[in-house]
Amino acid sequence: HAMNDMTDKSFDASAKTVLPAPDTTVDVRETFGIDIDWQVPAFSKPDERTPDLDEAYVFDPDTTLAILAGFAHDRRVMVQGYHGTGKSTHIEQVAARLNWPCVRINLDAHISRIDLVGRDAIVLRDGLQVTEFREGLLPWALQHPVALVFDEYDAGRPDVMFVIQRVLEQQGKLTLLDQNRVIRPDANFRLFATANTVGLGDTSGLYHGTQQINQGQMDRWNIVVGLNYLPAETEEAIVSAKNPDIDPKILADMIKVADLSRQGFINGDISTVMSPRTVITWAQNYAIFKDVGFSFRLSFLNKCDEEERMLVAEYYQRVFGEDLPESVVGKSA
């Protein structure tokens, strides 16, 4: 799902955002349903880089306030949580309501310093080949009223982290040595990150390829907020908003299975986890196939490692009281 703006190498460095700066405010109580008197700067119209608005999105109050502080007071905000808690979506949905342009870069996607900063490219000028510097996404974002979101921050390569560390300084200037240029950030440039671990390395070994975020890196983030899995009733509201015809009892049971998978994931028993998105898919498939067990296998079970399927089938059996072909009983039958 990790959307990546980095993959398009032919990035247009001359592109502008629709509006040069926020020109209005948004009332936090009215827009986000959080009981606080606060007007946050916003743009009156969206840009092509403003994320699409999900009307049914449910905001976690603490995380929302942290992200809003990032936008309103130029704080560097990091959102942490397990896989499937919707960290980047949360930042994007806040941005969507502020019409703030947003650029997401997944650091796990083997991004190099050159991708981020830019490269020399050979171009044709009046029929002659000349070398010119092509700006990467980072210099462009810095010079515009854009929220830059680094996803999978804990998986970034050292050369990339070194560049980001410079930008994290409070003045956040970026020096392009090859270019003899210093880029000062736009007054409305914002920086966010999402990370899968608490930066302390991961004791359960769940996230392969994540580095320990060093203390110097962590200290530069002004706000670090933890996003946990949703309370069951919130998740029910989200899934039924997308599947209004579902039987509430079946939905509640689906979420119980999802919770067992999350417990198992946190304990290190399984390596795949059911996110709210998985539950939505399961409910949609159930509407098509009219069979809870079969649609569970299609939506989640078949995505799990073969060794783990028996345990996952057991989660299902515990809640629905039905043995799936993958369960121990099913195997021996």
Residues covered by each model-derived region:
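Alpha-helical lid/collar subdomain of P-loop NTPases
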Residues: N4-D47, T64, Y229-E236, A241-A333
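AAA+ P-loop NTPase catalytic core and its hallmark functional loops
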Residues: N4-K249
